[in-house]
Amino acid sequence: MKMNTERFNLTVDEYLAETNVLFYLNDAVTQLLEHKEEYTQFGVVRYFAEYFTSVKNGNHVLFREFSYIKATPHNRESFIHIFWKCFRQIGKNGDLLAMSEYSSLLQLLCPDFPAEMVQNTARIVLIDDVTDCLMSFSDFIYSFQIQFFYEEFVESISAIYQDLLSGKNPNTVIVPTSTSVEQLSSSANDKPDVQEGVDATIFCECIEGLCERFKHKYPSTVAIKEILDNTQRVSFYGFLMALAKHEGINQDIGALPNKPDLLIDPEMDQELERLIAQVAISPTSNNNSSSSALGQKEMSKKASPRKSLHQRKRIEMESDGSTEETDSSEN
């Protein structure tokens, strides 16, 4: 988790709510009770220490159920970051994958990850094209970040967009200008055109009204206004793609580097170079045994993704987030 100096200005209750400490404590206790015999041998104090260290480092979401990885903003950010680290090599190789293939990759990390989330991401990349076209890693992951991290926001503005498209007044508390009222009235008399989109000014006012009372995470209103001020009309998926490409929004989430650095991971590259050097100087038998060990680890992950925390912790400590194994096996 990121260190936030403003936490010192919060009350105890505000801090607990903002950091979701009680959620993680409840999950830790639940897992402890479910695997009591195992953790008694492991050591309860050590268990709690490693659980919260895992939460802090962001690798606690590996192989967890979908309801868990989407439960908090930190979990969502951590999952996006792990997905990038695990499969960055796809983008580095320039591979294009279909929607079903990206869905399979996500389910390697989260067995019950819903295909609908991937379909919605593909619609952003392909601008609502239902065809299962091939997508680059960079286009997919930045669009996935918006769809997954801001899921509730995306659903809410979709409803607003559909109301505007059909000429209805969205159920949002806004203070419209005289100009926007005239524009809304005139648009109601016209037939909706999905391709043309809706008036960007009215859409922006509706979104700002939504954000004033929204309880979930949403992109910066400054960034939203910046995007919508540059056009007269906007389509829903065109707007989402603009959010996905906005560097400021990406930095606010904090899960991914900016696009020029997306395929760069110095620590991972150094580890890969070290492994390649070891293979180059090792005898064939040594190489085979090393490959076998990696294969066994991969098989153990896929065979039993719902491992107990203790088992997952051993994997994480061995692989430092499980990313080295993924990248090295792909190379």
From Swiss-Prot:
Region Disordered, annotated ranges: 283-331
GO (cellular component) term, any one: centriolar satellite
Main subcellular localisation: cytoplasm
Top-level taxon: Eukaryota
Basic residues composition bias: residue spans: 303-313
Start-end of Acidic residues biased regions: 318-331
Xref: CDD domains: DD_C11orf49 (cd22959)
Transmembrane segments: none
UniProt keyword annotations, A-Z: Cytoplasm, Cytoskeleton, Microtubule, Phosphoprotein
InterPro entries membership: CSTPP1
Disruption outcome: Mutants survive to adulthood and produce offspring. Embryos show a significant defect in heart looping, with an increased proportion of embryos without a looped heart. the They have an increased percentage of ciliated cells and ciliary length in Kupffer's Vesicle, although these alterations are not observed in the ear, pronephros or neural tube.
Localisation per UniProt entry: Cytoplasm, Cytoskeleton, Microtubule organizing center, Centrosome, Centriolar satellite; Cytoplasm, Cytoskeleton
Tissue expression profile of the protein: Expression in elevated in ciliated tissues/organs, including brain, spinal cord, kidney, eyes, ears and lateral line.
Main function: Regulator of the tubulin polyglutamylase complex (TPGC) that controls cytoskeletal organization, nuclear shape, and cilium disassembly by balancing microtubule and actin assembly. Regulates the assembly and stability of the TPGC and thereby modulates polyglutamylation of the microtubule, which antagonizes MAP4 binding.
Description of how the protein assembles with itself and partners: Interacts with PCM1. Interacts with the complex TPGC. Binds to alpha-tubulin.
Recorded family membership: Belongs to the CSTPP1 family.
Name of the featured protein: Centriolar satellite-associated tubulin polyglutamylase complex regulator 1
Organism per entry: Danio rerio (Zebrafish)
Gene: cstpp1
